[in-house]
Amino acid sequence: MAKVKEAKNIWLDGKLIPWSEANVHILSHSLHYGNAVFEGVRAYQTKKGLAVFRLAEHTKRLLDSAKACLINVPYSYDELFKAQVELLKSNDFKDTVYLRPIVFLGYGSMGVSHLGSPVQVALAAWEWGAYMGEDAIEKGIKVKISSWAKNSPNSMMSKAKASANYFNSQMANHDAITSGYDEALLLDQQGFIAEGSGECFFIVRNGVIITPPNDTSLESITQNTVIEIAKDLGYEVKRERITRDEVYIADEAFFTGTAAEVTPITNVDGRIIGNGKMEAITKKLQKTYFATVRGENEKYEKYLRSEEHTSEL
């Protein structure tokens, strides 16, 4: 993955501070026991300036994740929303930006129980283009169905964007990359397709777009956006379980996510998907998605928070 490109400022516990001064104690509770929640948000350059895509939904999901994980966030929705806008304004960004809000447990107690641990909040933002590279967006990627199964919702908080959940993702992703693939695709505990290591999964069969329900995965904001776009374009969309063999015979396949955006999949387990290139429906969805996040589609302008709107805060 791409190296982080340092920016000017980071927001930490209510204050904007220089990037190089954003440090935490080595005995911070979350570093040892894994209880932290975070978000991934994108901001794009538009004709109205830098615009954040679906900031309201991402901020709400951050607070919902914290609630599920028994973390009492010391800031309100409005405070966090405004802080993210102010962070972007304080940095001189010229390209696509990735925002990473994180709520974690700091230094003050040790042991499995997190009771009494101070809650800290950090907001970071840096320029970050295509998650898997521009070639992935244009030509597609190779994916491996992982031997690692998705966490059971009876074992982890599957609806929370919790740091601990991503150990499972990390192991699956590592196995895929070291096996010569670009990304992993995980099955759920019943053997149906769940999601990628950090993306939602879609297939197209006979003109119908199919994506799994969020039974064992995060309720994805990007997945929701792409479904809305697809329906508006006149496509039939089904939310139903997908088997491994259905993937192999799909006409098209693609990942969606804040980082991944809309990334075509051309190969799964060494099997060519469709004609081995990005096909018509994926291409149409990708084109419309990028037009949406870049402020070129008035229909979805409601999802953008641009520099023009900051005076309203």
Where are these regions (language model features)?
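Short secondary-structure junctions
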Residues: 89-97, 235
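Helix-start/capping segments and mature chain N-termini
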Residues: 1-75, 79-86, 110-307, 311
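Short, internal active-site loops enriched in acidic
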Residues: 104-109
